[in-house]
A protein has these predicted regions:
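Aromatic-glycine hotspot motif
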Residues: 1-44, 55-305
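Short-chain dehydrogenase/reductase
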Residues: 47
Length: 305
């Protein structure tokens, strides 16, 4: 490894404390404990894992390699540690304080490591022979960059699901107490009324459920272009009952959220071909659905006045 590479990895390790504090600043307890997919860790559990790896993996390995000749380096079972150390009930602020202290200790040790010492090595029980250079690369890229990326992905997913969960109540509030004639009045020719916008949101939920399922269980499915005005006429949006629309939208949205929550982590990266937007991941399509909700509920609020 060239000197500039070691320096780059060291700089990554030195920058992570500020990056991590920024990533979790202001997060609610609900966000911290949200699990993005079955069997996947929450942000809180990732923080606990980072703390324990900082101490029991990286700090311990650096120390042993610098002090001993080719020491044996045990593997650590992260899943077992999460259960044994009760990550789910940890206090995030305490965990981060402990991690910061450990990171400072690691940085101090690495600053003092001489050029010849970077070639010293230990023998990992599953990965084989690892030099100090190998370990700092794993520390910076496989640990810091990977876990910061996971935290950002969880925040995005949580935000999307929260937006989706909020839509039924927002739609109900936008329609509540509106006189029937106002509810069904079109603002101008070719523009939908309040009830037509609401019924469209309800029926697009079924379309999106189908798209999510096809993406989850297929390979890059292509989606058809919708003819929204023809749907509105065929399904009689103009005469829909607002209470029924809200009730059905709420039921369908609960099913959509249950479907998305049940998807394995990697499935959120699977793609489909949108007729106008091109290739989209499940995550991107879910964000578009939240945008779609907010767009039509916004139109209803404008029409309500």
């Amino acid at each position: 490894m060239e000197e500039f590479e070691r320096r780059r990895h060291f700089e990554t390790l030195a920058a992570t404390p500020q990056a991590l504090k920024a990533a979790i600043r202001g997060l609610s307890k609900k966000t911290l404990v949200f699990t993005p997919a079955p069997g996947k860790w929450s942000i809180l559990e990732i923080l606990c894992h980072m703390r324990d790896m900082e101490r029991d993996a990286y700090l311990a390995r650096y120390r042993r390699i610098l002090a001993e000749d080719e020491p044996r380096l045990p593997d650590l079972n992260g899943e077992a540690l999460a259960i044994e150390r009760n990550y789910r009930n940890a206090k995030a602020a305490e965990v981060v304080r402990e991690w910061l202290a450990l990171r400072r200790e690691n940085l101090q040790m690495l600053r003092k490591t001489g050029r010849a010492q970077w070639a010293r090595a230990g023998v990992h029980e599953t990965a084989g022979r690892l030099t100090m250079e190998d370990i700092i690369r794993r520390h910076a890229v496989g640990n810091d960059e990977a876990h910061l990326g996971q935290i950002e992905a969880i925040k995005r997913r949580f935000g999307i699901l929260e937006r989706l969960a909020a839509a039924p109540a927002a739609l109900a509030a936008a329609l509540k107490g509106v006189p029937d004639d106002v509810l069904r009045r079109r603002p101008e020719a070719g523009k939908w009324s309040m009830i037509e916008n609401a019924a469209h949101a309800r029926d697009l939920e079924r379309v999106y459920q189908g798209r999510f399922s096809r993406m989850a269980f297929g390979e890059r499915p292509a989606f058809w272009m919708l003819e929204n005005d023809r749907m509105a006429e065929a399904l009689k949006y103009a005469s829909a009952d607002p209470a029924d629309v809200v009730k059905e939208f709420r039921r369908l949205r609960e099913d959509t959220i249950a479907l998305l929550r049940a998807l394995p982590h990697e499935t959120w990266k699977k793609t489909g071909l949108h007729p106008t937007k091109g290739e989209l991941t499940v995550e991107q399509l879910a964000a578009r659905l939240a945008d779609h909700d907010e767009g039509h509920i916004g139109k209803i609020r404008i029409l309500r006045g």
